[in-house]
């Protein structure tokens, strides 16, 4: 499996458009306000406030106002006042806990107008981790389209948003960091769009992204690789020491499967016997 960054290096287009939030913040100075999650929540009238202002209702989600590293760094679900007063982090805020389904969208924008999008249904686990991300055909809700197009006037490029219960909880001026549904043809399409303003609509085959998260980085995880090799599953190992990893859980690896039920079975086997 090849990352978008690796594809762009291979195509000699590494500086054509950013693939991480740090580079996106620097490149798109006119639009990097989108990374301010507190302002984004306020804009949508989602109950929120900076710490140490105390919420009237629990549970809430606490996280950094701006996080350019990703991987849900600093994400915490706070269930009551007693837990809340223990948090002493600067630069954090809280927002209403949303318990609906989460959908992530990769979006193609031309001159402030959305011309294409790709949806992933994300099923959460603990502390900002996920069971899986499954590609599905689902349009962006009209109110979210209007919000994005009002905010991103004249912007041309890519955007990734995370939606729960009709609210944008996070937005990024880049494509999904794991880039698992797109092949080389689609990479060429993205390059042609940015270089020449030409975009071709393409079909995406169904597939699911299965992450494997760990707590103990000193454990020997050879049995995990043995299970994946037994099933002849293609996987990509993450750098568990990267500063972009989460505070509690680290993503050891991920694998992709076009058979959703088989992927769930393999993931269950890994978590049941190895972790």
Task: Map each language-model feature to its residues.
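ATP-dependent carboxylate/phosphate-activation module, predominantly the ATP-grasp catalytic core
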Residues: 101-102, 107-155, 167-213
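Short secondary-structure junctions
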Residues: 47-49, 89-90, 152-156, 231-236
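Active-site nucleotide/adenylate-binding loops and adjacent lid/helix of ATP-dependent enzymes
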Residues: 16-147
């Amino acid at each position: 499996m090849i990352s978008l960054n690796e594809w762009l290096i291979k195509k000699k287009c590494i500086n054509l458009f950013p693939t991480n939030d740090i580079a996106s913040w620097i490149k798109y100075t006119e639009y990097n306000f989108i990374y301010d999650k507190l302002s984004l929540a306020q804009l949508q009238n989602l109950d929120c406030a900076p710490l140490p202002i105390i919420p009237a209702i629990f549970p809430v989600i606490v996280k950094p106002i701006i996080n350019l590293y990703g991987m849900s760094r600093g994400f915490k679900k706070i269930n009551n006042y007693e837990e809340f007063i223990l948090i002493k982090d600067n630069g954090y805020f809280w927002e209403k806990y949303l318990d609906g389904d989460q959908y992530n969208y990769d979006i193609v924008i031309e001159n402030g107008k959305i011309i294409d999008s790709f949806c992933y249904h994300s099923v959460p686990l603990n502390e900002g981790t996920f069971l899986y991300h499954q590609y599905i055909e689902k349009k962006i809700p009209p109110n979210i389209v209007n919000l994005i197009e009002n905010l991103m006037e004249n912007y041309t490029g890519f955007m990734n948003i995370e939606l729960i219960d009709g609210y944008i909880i996070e937005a990024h001026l880049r494509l999904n960091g794991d880039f698992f549904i797109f092949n080389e043809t689609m990479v060429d399409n993205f390059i042609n769009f940015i270089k020449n303003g030409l975009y071709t609509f393409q079909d995406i085959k169904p597939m699911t992204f299965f992450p494997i998260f760990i707590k103990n980085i000193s454990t020997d995880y050879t049995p995990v690789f043995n299970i994946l090799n037994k099933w002849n599953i293609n996987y990509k190992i993450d750098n568990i020491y990267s500063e972009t990893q989460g505070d509690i859980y680290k993503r050891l690896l991920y694998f992709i499967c076009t058979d959703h039920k088989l992927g769930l079975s393999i993931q269950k086997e890994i978590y049941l016997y190895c972790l």
